[in-house]
Amino acid sequence: MKRYYYMDVLAILATIAVVFLHTSEYAFSNHTSDPHWIIAVILQVTFIWAVPIFFMMSGAHLLDYRERYNTSVFFKKRMAKVFVPFIFWSLVWYIINPFIFHKPTDYHIGQFVDAVMHDTIQPIFWFFYFIIGFYISAPLLSKITNKNDKTLSLYLLAVNMVFVNLLSYYYEIRSQTDNSFLHGVQIGAAGGVGFFVAGWYLKNTVLHKWQKNILYVAALASVVIMITLTIYLSIKRGKFVREVYDIWGLFGFVFSIGVFEFVKNHLETYRPSLKVQFVLQKVASTSLGVYVIHEFFIYFAERKLHIVDSSLKHMLILPVIVWLLSTALVLFIHKIPLLNKIV
C-alpha cells in the first residue's frame, strides 16, 4: 500500500493543534477586556482544523478500503484500533475524575455505561463517537465514493454544505432553533460526513491552480472572519460565542479543507530519506495516544504547578511541552506488549 507522507505530516500537525486548542480554553471565560483573552480566541480559531483533519484523513484512508480487504476485516481492524482505546481510556478517566475534581467516588457498572453512552466522562472524547459512527457508516459511504465517477460524492458534499455548513450554521450563530429540513434529510446532513468525504475527494482529485488559489484565499478569509466575528459577538452578547468557529460551520469547514489541500499540494510528492520516514511514521503513529492522555499533563500543570490558564505560558509554552511529553510517553507505551493496543 502506497504511503502518503503528507498524511504523516498532517497527523503530527493536527495532534499539536489539538493540544494548542486545549491550552487556550481561557477564551471561554469571555474576559473581553483582557488582551490575553484575544490571544486565546486567535489560538482557538487558528487551530480549529485539528479534529477535522483527523476526520478527513480517516475518509482519505478508509473510504476505498474495499480495494484492500473485505468489510469484515475492515471492522476488525478499525474497532481494535479505536474502540478498545476508547473504552479503556473512558474507564481510566471515569476512575480518576473524582480525584481530579474532588468529587465523591461512587463507581458502578451501570453508571459507567450510562456515562459512556452520554459522553459525560471526558469532554474531548466526543471525537470517538464521530469516528466510530463513521466506521459504522463506511461500508455504505464507500459505495458512494467512486474514483471513476465522483458525481455522487460531490452531491453528498453539496447536501452537507447547504444543510450543515450554511443553514444549520446560520441558525446556530443567531441562537435560533435549527431548521427542520436538517432533521428531514436522511443522508448527507450529519456534520462528520462532509469532512470524511471531503478528505477522500481531495486525496483522489487534482485541483486546478485557480481552484487551489480560491480555496486558499477563502480559507484565510474564513480565519479572519471567525476571529473578528467571535470577538465582536462575544463582546456584544456578553458571553463567549463559540458557535462562530464551529467546525460544522461554513468558515470552519472551508478553513479545514484549505489546510488539508495546502499540505497535500506541497508535500504529495515528498519522499523523505529513510531516517526521516522512520521518524515521521513513529511520531504520526502517536496521534491517538497523545489525544487520550495529553489532558493529564494539562491538569497536572494547572493543579500542581499552578500555571494559570490566562497566562501566555499556559497558551504558548505549555502546549509544546505537553505534546513532547505525551509523544514520548506514547512512544514508550508502544514498546510494551498489550499496552501498545490502548494507544
Language-model-derived ranges and their functions:
Residues 242-254, 306-327:
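Membrane-interface transmembrane-helix boundary segments in multi-pass integral membrane proteins
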Residues 210-278:
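Alpha-helical transmembrane segments and terminal signal-anchor/GPI-anchor hydrophobic tails
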